[in-house]
Regions:
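Helix-biased detector of long, well-ordered alpha-helical tracts
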Residues: 1-275
């Protein structure tokens, strides 16, 4: 069974009404958790300890941002290999703590275990009165993505070839669109962050809403199959196009409208981006 099918099979078996978004919404509180595992999401020889800590925190905060929520608290589980030094542990925790504070989030506890590899799992508790969900699409809605996609996959391929990439690479340090999401929220119908690639995440949104799409122009595989971008995939009604684009300009957020929602079964061909 392909990775995406196994993931959906597990989710379906949970049987909870709270499952299906970037975070579980319980009242005005949102709960989310993401793993960041060595040799699945990163290789230690590719990144400094500080970069590992920062990205682990960013990809978790991204779930809150994607749902128009304010991150409040973080709980961290870390599996520490025997070769990690105390100085490296300090560097890891300082990086995560500083990154969390950038978004108004406080680390309040967690757990540590010994292991063969460096694994991190972070739970974020956030709050929102108007969460942005994946559900709610309507026929004719426009589908758009923020940022310039493709850089994460391009740099990942370079790392595989043994090349160096820039310290500010999206693969190391993704950009979260908190200002855009907060200001555009009244006009947005649905949203999610792009973690598995534009193609796969578009399919997820269409599947949960039982719609298809019409593409305005072909999206290249280099863009659509680039995972771990952590940009936003959003939808909105056509009549809000000008206002949404104005907010994108005001928040310095590149925004590309690439498709519209339709009553068909069309889907992108996609695959997992993990190793």
């Amino acid at each position: 069974m392909p990775k995406q099918d196994k993931e959906q099979y597990l989710i379906n078996n949970l049987g909870s009404k709270y499952v299906g978004d970037d975070a579980a919404v319980v009242g005005d509180t949102l709960y989310s958790m993401d793993a960041f595992f060595e040799d699945t999401h990163f290789k230690r020889e590719w990144m400094s300890i500080a970069q590992i800590g920062r990205k682990a925190m960013l990809i978790n905060i991204s779930d809150a941002i994607a749902m128009n929520a304010q991150p409040k608290f973080a709980l961290i589980t870390v599996s520490l290999p025997h070769d990690v030094t105390e100085d490296q542990i300090d560097e890891l925790m300082t990086s995560m703590d500083n990154t969390a504070k950038e978004y108004g989030c406080e680390i309040i506890g967690g757990d540590t275990i010994g292991g063969d590899k460096l694994h991190l799992s972070i739970t974020i508790v956030s709050q929102s009165d108007t969460p942005l969900l994946r559900t709610g699409l309507k026929e004719g809605d426009l589908l758009a993505y923020t940022g310039v996609l493709g850089g994460s996959k391009r740099d990942l391929d370079a790392l595989y070839r043994g090349e160096k990439i820039a310290d500010d690479s999206r693969f190391f340090d993704p950009t979260l669109r908190a200002d855009f999401v907060a200001k555009a929220r009244p006009l947005l119908r649905t949203g999610m962050d792009i973690s598995d690639g534009l193609f796969c995440d578009t399919n997820k949104m269409l599947d949960i809403n039982k719609y298809g799409f019409h593409e305005f122009e072909k999206v290249d595989d280099e863009i659509g199959l680039s995972g771990e971008e952590f940009e936003m995939l959003v939808s909105f009604a056509p009549e809000h196009y000008s206002d949404v684009m104005q907010i994108a300009e005001e928040t310095n957020t590149p925004l590309t409208v690439y498709a519209k929602v339709a009553k068909n079964d069309d889907r992108y061909t996609c695959k997992s981006h993990h190793f």
